[in-house]
Amino acid sequence: ETPQSVKVLTREYLDDANINSFQDMLNTVTGLAANRWDERQYPTARGFEVDYYLFDSVPSTVGMDASDPDLTMYDRVELVKGANGLMTGAGNPAIAINMIRKHADSKELTGRLSTSFGSWDNYSSTVDISAPLTRDGDVRGRLVVKHETKDSFMDGYEKENNVLYGVIDADLTDSTYVSVGASYQNLERDGVRWGGLPAFYSDGTRTNFDRSKIISSDWTYWDTDTISAFATMKQKLFKDVNLNINYSYRELKQETALLYFGPSYANGGTVPNTGTVDKATNQGVGSLSTWSDRTKTTENNIDTFISAPFTLGGLQQEVVAGFMYNQSKNDTWYSGSPTLSGATIDFDDINMPLAGDISNTNLYQVPNKTTQTGAYLAGKFILLEPLKLITGVRVSNWKYESEDGVNNRKFNNEVTPYAGLVFDFLDDYSWYASYTEIFKPEDKRNVNGEYLDPRNGNSLETGLKGEFLDGQLNASLAVFKTQQDNVAEAIDNVFIPDANGDPTKEQAYRSVDGVESKGIEFELDGKITNNWDMSFGITHFSAEDAAGKKVETLASRTTANLFTKYTLDKWSVGGGVNYKSAFYTGEGSQKITQDAYALANLMVAYDIDQNIKAQLNINNLFDKKYYEGIGVNSMVYGEPRNATLTFRYQF
């Protein structure tokens, strides 16, 4: 009954497609583009950056571009396309990615053990066990443990991933439910890249490196530790009136030592005069520097609401009132060597020694805090038997504080209205439409180092939804349009200068008014027969500013995703295709384009007995060479063909 495009990535689908990490998942979502830049990915949807996420429907503003949460801890992922400001507050009209945690739902001892072997010495083992903690099963526990080690197609790259997750769910009384849990993920990556390879030879033609080549050294690393804790209480107050209280805490620690090579700019110009590669010598001259940082980000969330159903005119209605609080704190200690312009790097032997200790000199502390509160009132009303109105309003306050007081800012009493209609014109078909407004403080800065004004606008969506084959197959068709002012647009080859006026590595942006994104989306999910599962989606959109200039050109305008599986007796055979249309960055001689491409994937599974399954997954079946990310005079290659063999034992 949500008047927007909705999709659920089930645990069965995640297992079948061998999707184990957050970054892997992003590449399979219709309408979502994820431009990779070293260990980080920057997802966009409908032409706008994805800037918030949800855990058990509680919003989080702490980014996940580098921490890459492991999906072993989650039961499913729920996706709501478009603006979702009523329930989340400040944010872009892109997509709400809701990570639903696993819970202890079984009153009997159950579990699953799995082990995987894959390309580039990829080994992982997972234990997932649920059990009653009391004789009647009213108190239950679940524990998930995972260990993974992996090399890579990239020279010198190694990764180790460790996950620990536990949750206790309790039915304290017939009217009181409580859940408490915590998780820890340690992700260590050595031999990492920071940025991409040069895109051009010195004669202006495009480079063509082996996909194994990266700019890195054996002393580089990128480590993250993520700690989460949460508590939920659901209390039935009287009749059908329910109180929900949610609290969550996240702590992200990051430590890096990195090597950077990029273009140099002459006399403050915007066109690089170095950073290319000589074809004859395979050497490049450009800007070389090292970097180290230690970052700690903590976040506290409180989400509480009361839902009260009632009857009016013989029809069922519901009102929800809630309050949300979110505060994130960030502390960063960083240092690095001065940028060395005119440095030479040999792309036949990139490994470069570390000139000195970069982790204990010239440390700077930049603490800051962002606080957001919001109160909302929403209702679902049946106006006539086939016609429902979903409407609400949210009032938000947002404040950013830095210890030095620089760029402190706040916005109070920002009102976000929402309205939607759902009309069930046949038993299995409905039409819907929705409207909401948008408010988002900008975290991008202009060339003077000043934060841009908040973006604002509105989003419209209308479409059809239908059920087929006795509800086993769902289809939806949506048309959407979003208009925004004060949208941040990167200024090509312009970076924010430091105190001496020299360019840093921080991209400079400008505000653009009249940005309009519009498009169409179709999705089909479910079972065609009892043996045949199908998931298909395709999205096309355009995004331009008031002058007709394309914005967010790093996002493919058309994306399509297909995954299907057919089961016969003990065998299951399936596969998928992920398609992305062309995307580009830069202009003129500095323009870099990734042409349209499609990646094919294959899976074959066999039930050895009723408890044991073997499954083979092959990604990039035809070994397509493509750019997973592009930037200023640089690009990042995607993974070549790779395979994983998994054994699962379930009891």
Segments the model singles out, each with a brief description of its role:
Residues 234-236, 242-248, 252-258, 431, ...:
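Membrane-embedded beta-barrel scaffold of Gram-negative outer-membrane proteins
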Residues 169-171, 297, 316-328, 366-484, ...:
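Structural signature of Gram-negative outer-membrane beta-barrels, strongest in the C-terminal barrel
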Residues 463, 637-651:
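Outer-membrane beta-barrel "beta-signal"
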Residues 230-252, 286-403:
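Face-selective signature of the C-terminal outer-membrane beta-barrel domain
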Residues 72-75, 86-164, 172-176, 227, ...:
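Outer-membrane beta-barrel translocator/receptor signature
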Residues 384-386, 481, 510-588, 607-613, ...:
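Gram-negative outer-membrane beta-barrel transporters
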Residues 1, 8-11, 22-28, 41-83:
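Periplasmic plug
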Residues 148-152, 165-171, 175-236, 251-297, ...:
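Acidic/polar loop-and-plug regions of large Gram-negative outer-membrane beta-barrel proteins
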